[in-house]
Amino acid sequence: MGNVEIPNWLKALPLAPVFRPTDTEFADPIAYISKIEKEASAFGICKIIPPLPKPSKKYVFYNLNKSLLKCPELVSDVDISKVCKEDRAVFTTRQQELGQTVKKNKGEKGKSNSQRSGVKQVWQSGGVYTLDQFEAKSKAFYKTQLGTVKELAPVVIEALFWKAALEKPIYIEYANDVPGSAFGEPEDHFRHFRQRKRRGRGFYQRKTENNDPSGKNGEKSSPEVEKAPLASTSLSSQDSSKQKNMDIVDEMEGTAGWKLSNSSWNLQMIARSPGSVTRFMPDDIPGVTSPMVYIGMLFSWFAWHVEDHELHSMNYLHTGSPKTWYAVPCDYALDFEEVIRKNSYGRNIDQLAALTQLGEKTTLVSPEMIVASGIPCCRLVQNPGEFVVTFPRSYHVGFSHGFNCGEAANFGTPQWLNVAKEAAVRRAAMNYLPMLSHQQLLYLLTMSFVSRVPRSLLPGGRSSRLRDRQREEREFLVKRAFVEDILNENKNLSVLLREPGSRLVMWDPDLLPRHSALALAAAGVAGASAVSPPAVAKKELEEGHSELQNKEKTSLLEELSLFMEKLNDVYYDDDDGLLNDFQVDTGTLPCVACGVLGFPFMSVVQPSEKALKDLSERQGETDAQEIMTLSSEKSDCEWKTSSRYIRPRIFCLEHTIELQRLLQSRGGLKFLVICHKDFQKFKAHAAIVAEEVKVPFSYDDVLLESASQEELSLIDLAIEDEEKYEHSVDWTSELGINLRYCVKVRKNSPTKKIQHALSLGGLFSDTSQMLDFTTIRWLQRKSRSKAKPSSTSSFTPCEHLEVKADGKLRDNLDSQTGKKEEKIIQYSRKKKLNPKPSAEQVQELATLAKSKDFDKTCKNFSSRSHLDSAIRSEMNSEIGDSGRVIGVSFSINPCSSSFTVGHGQEHPEITVKFGSDLDGNVTNSLSMVNGDSADLTLTSISREQHQGHSMTSNNNGSNSGSHVVASQTILVSTGDNHDGPRKLSGDYVCSDVSVRGIQEAVEMSDQEFGEPRSTVTNIEDEQQSQIVKPTQREAVFGDHEQVEGAEAVSTRENLCSEIILHTEHSSAHVGMEIPDINTASENLVVDMTHDGEPLESSDILSSSNGDEASSNGLQVLNDELSMESEVSSSENTEVIEAPNSMGEAKKKRKIESESETNDNPESSIGFIRSPCEGLRSRGKRKATCETSLKHTETSDEEKKPIAKRLKKTPKACSGSRQQEVPTTTHPNRCYLEGCKMTFESKAKLQTHKRNRCTHEGCGKKFRAHKYLVLHQRVHKDERPFECSWKGCSMTFKWQWARTEHLRLHTGERPYICKVDGCGLSFRFVSDYSRHRRKTMHYVT
């Protein structure tokens, strides 16, 4: 077998994570799994290796045979009289198909014959085996497939398995879903679990008796009579084997299997573990709350599937050969279903049918297809003695490497609550009955965390070890979900109770008419069975007498110890008392619309008479006549119950609200909101729980009245009809809101694509018609070429601006679908504004822009077209997020200029063109794409009006107005038309862009502008570059009169000689360069970052006739850029500022904050103020850093305040100035008591300085700052302490934890009980504290 070729895809599959809990962590399985869930759920599966060796084969077989004997349905086909007791422990297997039936046709490689690829045949074979028999058959099959090779590498067997899946079919047997367990029953633990298990079995037994059809001759079969032969045979052999069983138990006590069975990881108890959401499930369901056994052979496989209700699952391999697992993370479940639908079921099948087919657990496809589709998948090899945990919504598949015996059960951590509701809807859509109500389980689990007696009254302090802290975190998540659910129900309730005629009543399931009759019948049966035979009564009296004598012999100390153990059980582990306080078995009702078992609020709904008349017009003559008759005869009756078609139905509150909106135009509906009587008990604790988890509890109290007898009858009728006529046609199916009816129709008639009227997570959507945004090529219109003007006057290309802001490509594109955002487009402009062009003018130019002649005349313009195309093609490959990706192409030329906005899904392209008419007036036009409107307001520039004071004509006829003297921010709304303002939905925090250069970059003379340059500045001039706060991000475009008022500045401030680009963001680092290009055009490169991610540089081309561009470039500084980021930037830079710049900076920040708060409200709804409206001119920059630091008042240029700017540091500037700049300063860094923590905001820093933890969900307060610093190890998982024992590599967060760990190596037991006569010693203080609490060994 050494020549087996391992596929490359199999070699590349990553391994799932493996965890090794310590003895302390192993004590609480739910707490430990909750701890690793964040890391492990990213893979969908993980392996946990317990700190105990695997159990022996003898121990496993003994417990499994003992468990199989308790299932009489497994031995129904065996003649008990002919076999011994061990041979009666049998199980049945299921035959599986592995391979493909391929029929080769001419010209084709092969096709699957009569069945789709990936769907395998699984059926009952009828084979009955004992463990020894099936093991022998498995070994024989192994030899036929692999020969005499005993051990093969797991990857080799995996390659052989997937190779066999593509070849001629072979048939394997697999004993799956066998009720039972190979764990031994724990001793003196989980007493309440065994009691509930008996109660659950009794519930199923009563249900079977009530629903069991009559046997032969019309007589009901009696379970007692059927079990009599088996019971008598068992009793006859019980005495002979009793001593043998006792010897085996004594022999196995203390072994690895015995220790594991008596731990919390015993799968018989995992579903009922403290902290598991499934702990309070009322029924005992095999495979969910009780484990099932899986006995396999070589290549026995289980199909791709998720667990019932998408719960967690825990699997333990007791003995035998390994198993291989493959899993897909839960985040890719929808993608996985789509790949399976297209490649295995065919594209004609819809999403719901594919989901149903996957639920049948017959789909076996290779992970190669999954990985090839871009979906991550991992593999895992489970060896005997190891646990495998799968997480909610994670699809997994696997197979066995030989004979083995495994076991599995379900449970749920608090994280399952995030998917519980959607999982219930998907289960109902697959036509499966719900097994649980996630709301009821949440409420009961929360109540189990609420102590009925304050824990402070318990003797002895609680331990603060890791297990207790994990328990507190687990309780926090559950309690917070509990409060949020109650508030959400209250919100829905408030909406419904505002409707006229609404009513809320409290109902008791025990008071329903039908339930009362059944209760009386059950009481009569119980009374008849209460008469015990004399022998049984005598035996009970003797047992009671002996028990009394034993109690008399019990010492006072033992009684106190027993009392404390029971008290601790009540507070922490025992839940029998809690179950007695609430009605667990009744009170959950399924919603017609979604199939979810609702609790505690539901509603009984019926259409109004007007709505019924509207429905009658759509029905046949018989139904319409019946509806009209009922409407006329019983018009005085509010509820109509005689017709099955219009019978009242049960809905959850959420879908009652949706149904009310749906029928609002048809006459509305009648509804009765019903509240379970236990809700008052839950609500009594809600305010206290909300205070514990720090959630505001704003609850609107409503009046709860007890339901009248008529209302109870109405509720009972609705429940009874749900059971009898769940698939029949009625008004809910007519409206398309009956989920089970929709599923039934789609299953029976696949051609009928019936749709559900309410939103159910897209289950009824046709995914084949959904857009795949990853394959969309975002269009970018090319720049217009230069046009040949008919006028004799010549023009020179003046400006070409191209801005590109790119964000990180996200994987989840559909989450951004539907977001309409305002984009910020920045362009250069002159100060003087013209009135807004008329609508006719815009429409005329838009028509002209679309004409072919216009395209031909402009195709030769722009020498930079090849650069534009390259940048646009690069942008097309990178755009993927509508919220963060903006592509803007902006150009201005005498004939036509346009800019293109490329962004997300809503508007792939928006083109706006500027044209110059023969008179020189710049006009605007707008081109709409995909039929969507884009509101845009641009400014027009009149050269005639501007020429007198800001523009001149040079000798060669070119327009000197091409100088960039200011920058204006324009907000373009790409959404629908709105009358009011809308806030920007993105996270862009963009300042007004002011362009300031140095004298070397742009040099303009005073004579060129027709007026002298002013050197007088004031404080207001310094504040023109403002930060755009979130409240200022409103895109409303009005007339230009509103803008002109905000842009009124002196003429001297418009004519700036320098350009600076400011981009305000919390983490933006901006750099600018202007390389040397010809005088006709200059290339400006801007480097930006957004949220810590680098944005690609975009080219900004500005031309100035006669201007010179410095190769050193423009230096840009963010006003709030930290000193640390300046020093650690990629280029060696330093901050150059005046000696009193720190004081000026503080004053400037204060003035900025005041100007922002006192700003005119109208300024937030018009154009953003240009930074050039108040720019001050400043002096030339000195050549060296020494001269740049000097402040000379005699020079006019040096009298101006020196602005803070970023400058390349020459090598000569490495003196004392660099030492003065702190290299590790940070605006939000803590320096208390040696603390060096940094924070995102000043608010968190202030909270931190108050000795309070800023981690989300924590908020703990400490009496000293050093304790807060140490506390951060909990959240950062820092482990600075290492075990000093040679060969041990364990690390610890705390010194005391390492000290206690060292006692495991040294054997030290320092804690000794000081009570006389005890003398027990303990290694850990927690064990000593527990001993004192249980035995009351306190020494005063």
Curated annotation (Swiss-Prot):
Zinc finger regions, C2H2-type: 1228-1250, 1251-1275, 1281-1305, 1311-1337
Keyword check for DNA repair: no
Limits of the JmjN domain: 16-57
Biased composition (Low complexity): 1124-1133
Major localization class: nucleus
This enzyme's EC code(s): 1.14.11.-
Basic and acidic residues bias locations: 217-227, 1188-1201
Keywords for the protein's UniProt record, in alphabetical order: Activator, Chromatin regulator, Dioxygenase, Iron, Metal-binding, Nucleus, Oxidoreductase, Repeat, Transcription, Transcription regulation, Zinc, Zinc-finger
SMART domains: JmjC, JmjN, ZnF_C2H2
Cross-referenced InterPro entries: JmjC_dom, JmjN, Znf_C2H2_sf, Znf_C2H2_type
MF terms (GO), sorted A to Z: histone H3K27me2/H3K27me3 demethylase activity; zinc ion binding
Motif Nuclear localization signal 1, residue numbers: 818-825
Annotated positions binding Zn(2+) 1: C1230, C1235, H1248, H1265
Binding site for Zn(2+) 2: C1253, C1258, H1271, H1275
Swiss-Prot/TrEMBL GO biological process terms: epigenetic regulation of gene expression; negative regulation of long-day photoperiodism, flowering; negative regulation of short-day photoperiodism, flowering; positive regulation of gene expression; regulation of DNA-templated transcription; regulation of vernalization response; response to brassinosteroid; unidimensional cell growth
Sequence positions that bind Zn(2+) 4: C1313, C1318, H1331, H1337
Residues involved in Zn(2+) 3 binding: C1283, C1288, H1301, H1305
Effect of gene knockout: Early flowering a reduced number of rosette leaves at bolting stage, but normal development of all other organs. Hyper-methylated genes with accumulation of H3K27me3 histone marks. Reduced FLC expression. Partially redundant with JMJ14. Brassinosteroid-insensitive phenotype.
Tissue specificity field: Expressed at low levels in seedlings, cotyledons and leaves. Detected in inflorescences, stems, roots and siliques but not in shoot apical meristems or root tips. Accumulates in flowers and embryos.
Role according to the record: Histone demethylase that demethylates 'Lys-27' (H3K27me) of histone H3, thus acting as a positive regulator of gene expression. Demethylates tri-methylated (H3K27me3) and di-methylated (H3K27me2) H3K27me. Inactive on H3K27me1, H3K4me3, H3K9me2 and H3K36me3. Acts as a repressor of the photoperiodic flowering pathway and of FT. May also be active on H3K4me. Binds around the transcription start site of the FT locus.
Family statement drawn from the similarity comment of this UniProt entry: Belongs to the JHDM3 histone demethylase family.
Quaternary organization: Interacts with BZR2 (via N-terminus).
Protein name (Swiss-Prot/TrEMBL): Lysine-specific demethylase ELF6
